Amino acid sequence: MDRHLDKIFLRGLVVHTRIGPCGKAALTSLEADLEVAIDLSFAVSSDKLSDTANYSDLARAISDVLMSSRHPNLGEAASAAAEAVLSTEQKVCEVLLTLRNSRVVLKGPVDQIGVSVRKCRR
């Protein structure tokens, strides 16, 4: 995420979804962090909200994808959510989306597992 673009971020969006083998039986809470690369120069000079990305729309795009169907794994879920952000907001050039799951059972002391995906507009 360089290209000298500005960044907008959302941190700690919690979404309840069905994911992985355990998702057949119960909902899992995932935490999402989003960072988007966007040119904010028009928004700064115009002072119009329509010249920037809508935070609510970004959060809704992620939530809708994660809640709409059961995902086989974190990587697929993150990829689908990142693509939804690009589809929702045409001003966004690049998306970095991280999904974390803190309700995981692994051998050894692990607080969370997660995945980050980066998607670029073509």
PLM regions: where:
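N-terminal, polar/charged subdomain of small-to-medium soluble alpha/beta proteins
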Residues: 1-122
